Curated annotation (Swiss-Prot):
Residues 268-482 form the Histidine kinase domain. Its main location: membrane. It catalyses: ATP + protein L-histidine = ADP + protein N-phospho-L-histidine. The gene is cusS. InterPro entries: CusS-like_sensor (IPR048590), CztS_silS_copS (IPR006290), HAMP_dom (IPR003660), HATPase_C_sf (IPR036890), His_kinase_dom (IPR005467), HisK_dim/P_dom (IPR003661), HisK_dim/P_sf (IPR036097), Sig_transdc_His_kin-like_C (IPR004358). It is an enzyme of class 2 (transferase). It comes from Escherichia coli O157:H7. The modification Phosphohistidine is found at H271. GO terms for molecular function: ATP binding; phosphorelay sensor kinase activity. One of its GO terms (cellular component) is plasma membrane. Residues 207-260 form the HAMP domain. It is found in: Cell inner membrane. This is Sensor histidine kinase CusS. Residues 1-15, 208-482 are cytoplasmic.
Length: 482
C-alpha cells in the first residue's frame, strides 16, 4: 500500500492573507458591479425620458386632424432636424415607410433584430445594433453610432378606430456605452492595483499581528530543564493568546511536578538501595576482618538475608509500579466477597496487631465486587500496614465496607496524629513521606500507598484520604461489576 506523501498545511499567514484579500477584493468588485449597473440603469432612464419627450412632441404634430400628410411630414422634418443622435421612421397603416431621417438608413429595416432592453424600467423599449453612421457626438465632434435604444408607437388621426401611422424613434447610446466601457476599464485597472496593495498590506498586518506569537515562542524556547519554575504572563499577550498561555503554564507546571518527582524518585531509590547495600558491605567486612564462629557467621548471613529480602521487595514493588505506568497492570477479575478478603488480610496482620496492642475491626455487609483477589489483598495490606504504623496502642483500626449506587466503598480508619492538609494530595506519590527527614526507621520503602493507587486505578476506581483530629481515613471506591 502506497502511503500518501505528507502535505504540510498552509501557514496561518498565508491563509489569513488569502481570505482577507479575497473578501476585500470581492467586496470591491461587488461595489464596482453595483456602480456599473447603476450607471447603466441611469443612462437607460435618461434615454427613455428623452425618447418620451421626443415622441410626445412628434405625436402632437402627427395627431393634428386638420393637416395634410405632406404638411405633417414637413413639420416633422423641421422638428427632427433639431435633435442630434436621433433617427426617425414613420410608416403608414399599410406598413409603407412614408418618412425616415434624411441621410440615414430606414431604422425599420433593423427593427426585426431588436431585442428588449433589460435596463429599461417600464415601457416597450428595444435595443438595436445598427445602422452604423457618423453623427455629432457629445463634445467629441462626429463619431460613429451603431447602437440605439428604440421605441415604437401608433400615432396620427384615427381611421376605423386605429391611428394611421406607426412612429419609430431610435436614440444613439454609443456615447453612454463608451462611457461605461471606459469606466469599467478604469475600475479594472484600479481593482488590479488595489488588489496588489491589499495583498501586501494584509501580509504586513498579519506579520505584525503574529508578533505576540513569535514573542511567546521565543520565551518558550528559552525555558530549559533548569527554568521549569518560569511562567508566561498572560497579561502581556493579546486576549486571543491568553488561553494558550494559561494552558502552557498548566502544562509546564505539570512537567515541573513530574520532573521534581522524578528527581526525588531517583534520589530516593538511590538512598533506599544504598542503605541496605552499605549494611551488607559493612557486615560482610566485619565478618571477614577476623575468624568467626559458625554462630556469628549465621547471624551475619541472617542479617544479610533480611536486607536482601527488603531490597527484593522494593525491586518487586518498583517493577509493579512500572507495569502500572505502562498500562500493563491488567487485573484478573472475578466476583469476590470483600468481607472474606478483609478477613484473610486480618489473619496475616493479627499477630503484629496484638504485639502493638491494636485491635482490628470489620464493619459492614458482605460486599460483592469484581476484582483481582491478589491485587486487592495487596492494596488492603498496604493500607493496614500503614495504619498499624501510626495507630497508638490500645486503639482500633476499623475497616468498613458498603455498597452505594452500584459502587463499593472500602474505608480504612485509624486514630492517630492528624496529617497536615498540605501533605494529603501527595500521600500517594512514590517515596513521599510526611516526615521531612524521610528516613524514619521501620517506615517502609515509601511506595506502599503509590501501589494502592495503581491497583485501584487498574480496577477503574478511585482512592482518597482525609485526616483530622479523630484520625486518618482512606476511602477506596470500586465499580461493583468492574
Amino acid at each position: 500500500m502506497v502511503s500518501k506523501p505528507f502535505q504540510r498545511p498552509f501557514s496561518l499567514a498565508t491563509r489569513l492573507t488569502f481570505f482577507i484579500s479575497l473578501a476585500t477584493i470581492a467586496a470591491f468588485f461587488a461595489f464596482a458591479w453595483i456602480m456599473i449597473h447603476s450607471v447603466k440603469v441611469h443612462f437607460a432612464e435618461q434615454d427613455i425620458n428623452d425618447l418620451k419627450e421626443i415622441s410626445a412632441t412628434l405625436e402632437r404634430v402627427l395627431n393634428h386632424p386638420d393637416e395634410t400628410q405632406a404638411r405633417r411630414l414637413m413639420t416633422l422634418e423641421d422638428i427632427v432636424s433639431g435633435y442630434s443622435n436621433v433617427l426617425i421612421s414613420l410608416a403608414d397603416s399599410h406598413g409603407k415607410t412614408v418618412y425616415h431621417s434624411p441621410g440615414a438608413p430606414d431604422i425599420r429595416e433593423f427593427a426585426r433584430d431588436a431585442i428588449p432592453d433589460k435596463d429599461a424600467r417600464g415601457g416597450e423599449v428595444f435595443l438595436l445594433s445598427g445602422p452604423t453612421m457618423m453623427m455629432p457626438g457629445h463634445g467629441h465632434g462626429h463619431m460613429e453610432h451603431s447602437n440605439w435604444r428604440m421605441i415604437s408607437l401608433p400615432v396620427g388621426p384615427l381611421v376605423d378606430g386605429k391611428p394611421i401611422y406607426t412612429l419609430y424613434i431610435a436614440l444613439s447610446i454609443d456615447f453612454h456605452l463608451h462611457y461605461i466601457n471606459d469606466l469599467m476599464n478604469k475600475l479594472i485597472m484600479t481593482a488590479s492595483v488595489i488588489s496588489i496593495l491589499i495583498v501586501f498590506i494584509v501580509l504586513l498586518a498579519v506579520h505584525k499581528g503574529h508578533a505576540p506569537i513569535r514573542s511567546v515562542s521565543r520565551q518558550i524556547q528559552n525555558i530549559t530543564s533548569k527554568d521549569l519554575d518560569v511562567r508566561l504572563d498572560p497579561q502581556t499577550v493579546p486576549i486571543e493568546l491568553e488561553q494558550l498561555v494559561l494552558s502552557f503554564n498548566h502544562m509546564i507546571e505539570r512537567i515541573e511536578d513530574v520532573f521534581t518527582r522524578q528527581s526525588n524518585f531517583s534520589a530516593d531509590i538511590a538512598h533506599e538501595i544504598r542503605t541496605p547495600i552499605t549494611n551488607l558491605i559493612t557486615q560482610t567486612e566485619i565478618a571477614l576482618s577476623q575468624s568467626r564462629s559458625q554462630k556469628e557467621l549465621e547471624d551475619v548471613l541472617y542479617s544479610n538475608l533480611e536486607e536482601l529480602t527488603r531490597m527484593a521487595k522494593m525491586v518487586s514493588d518498583m517493577l509493579f509500579l512500572a507495569q502500572a505506568d505502562n498500562n500493563q497492570l491488567i487485573p484478573e477479575k472475578k466476583m469476590l466477597n470483600l468481607a472474606d478478603e478483609v478477613g484473610k488480610v486480618f489473619d496475616f496482620f493479627e499477630a503484629l496487631a496484638e504485639d502493638r496492642g491494636v485491635e482490628l475491626q470489620f464493619v459492614g455487609d458482605e460486599c460483592q465486587v469484581a476484582g483481582d483477589p491478589l491485587m486487592l489483598r495487596r492494596a488492603l495490606s498496604n493500607l493496614l500496614s500503614n495504619a498499624l504504623r501510626y495507630t497508638p496502642p490500645g486503639e482500633a483500626i476499623v475497616v468498613r465496607c458498603q455498597t452505594v449506587d452500584h459502587l463499593v466503598q472500602v474505608i480504612v480508619e485509624n486514630p492517630g496524629t492528624p496529617i497536615a492538609p498540605e501533605h494529603l494530595p501527595r500521600l500517594f506519590d512514590r517515596f513521599y513521606r510526611v516526615d521531612p527527614s524521610r528516613q524514619r526507621k521501620g517506615e517502609g520503602s515509601g511506595i506502599g500507598l503509590a501501589i494502592v493507587k495503581s491497583i485501584v486505578v487498574a480496577h477503574k476506581g478511585t482512592v482518597a484520604v482525609t485526616s483530622n483530629a479523630r484520625g486518618t481515613r482512606f476511602v477506596i471506591v470500586l465499580p461493583e461489576r468492574g
